[in-house]
Amino acid sequence: MIVKFEKFEKLKKPLVIFLMGPTACNKSLLAMTLKDILPIELVSVDSALIYRGMDIGTAKPSNMELLKYPHFLVNIRDPLQTYSVGEFYKDILKIIDYIHSINKVPLLVGGTMFYFKILLTGGLSNLPSSNDNIRKYLLTLLQKKSKFFLFNQLKSIDPISAERIHFNDVQRVLRALEVFFISGKTLTELCRLKNFVSPYNIVQFSLMPESKEWLFNKITIRFKKMLSCGFEYEVKKLFNRGDLHKNLPSIRCVGYRQMWDYFMHNLTYDDMICESLKATKRLVKSQLTWLNNWKKLNVLSSSDTLKNLITKIISVINANIFV
């Protein structure tokens, strides 16, 4: 039975629902279950699910699930392509407007916290243009020192940007440092638009684990299941294409990078498993750090039953729908 919301024209602002949380907390299952009973459309907010042919290692909903529960922003890029934060912001605004136009509510589900934050803060502000002298200085540092030196500089100046930029993504590290040296403000500071008022009534939920230990154990079990379901073969097909490399954003996804190193004989099979689990746990810690500092968040427990979770979500939405 579909639970009806009040008429949309009565809302002061159109409704948008966030369902966030660390990896392996069953966000997708909850979102798909909600779609059975609420007038919603699902939108993926996951920087890994955008890639075609990367299904097992990203824990993407199955083809059958996607057929029954379509998700916007899933399978929209080839692994050779990139997808910037700016592109996401433009796409998500169009998608939200479309969903509202068909009298549905967008439910944004995923674990890429920076994408959620961008929607709350109004996108990326105008960043300073590149400065040739500063860029030359940074390139000289890169040549004389190393990419690790530059990344550590970024970590000390702008730890939030360092959390979301991989140290191998040298161009983005350089750009973040360049922005700071030109403007005197970090990329994170410049991305927070002052006095931005969202045009949406955003109700935010996070699905949180009962403990880190519980989640880490689940991550281990899940990765072993991925291996048994053909994850190695999935990455091997990408590896054999010949046009992909490990510094692409797609191949830097957790698990794919480590399996790539295994194929390049940089890791043993056992080390690949160990490093994949370590990388996943680092990702989880980063996600939890974001969420622990998040404002106006309705926290749900992943150990709760689906029935109870749905009841709580509907109750919170009804309480906030005319705010």
Swiss-Prot record:
Key words, A-Z: ATP-binding, Magnesium, Nucleotide-binding, Transferase, tRNA processing
Region of interest (Interaction with substrate tRNA), ranges: 46-49, 171-175, 252-257
Marked site (Interaction with substrate tRNA) residue numbers: T112, R135
Reported cofactor(s): Mg(2+)
Catalytic reaction list: adenosine(37) in tRNA + dimethylallyl diphosphate = N(6)-dimethylallyladenosine(37) in tRNA + diphosphate
Pfam families: IPPT (PF01715)
Record-listed E.C. numbers: 2.5.1.75
GO BP terms, alphabetized: tRNA modification
Residues the entry annotates as binding ATP: G21, P22, T23, A24, C25, N26, K27, S28
One MF annotation (Gene Ontology) recorded for this entry: tRNA dimethylallyltransferase activity
Binding positions for substrate per the UniProt entry: T23, A24, C25, N26, K27, S28
Subunit structure: Monomer.
Protein family membership: Belongs to the IPP transferase family.
Function field: Catalyzes the transfer of a dimethylallyl group onto the adenine at position 37 in tRNAs that read codons beginning with uridine, leading to the formation of N6-(dimethylallyl)adenosine (i(6)A).
Protein name, as recorded: tRNA dimethylallyltransferase
Designated gene of the protein: miaA
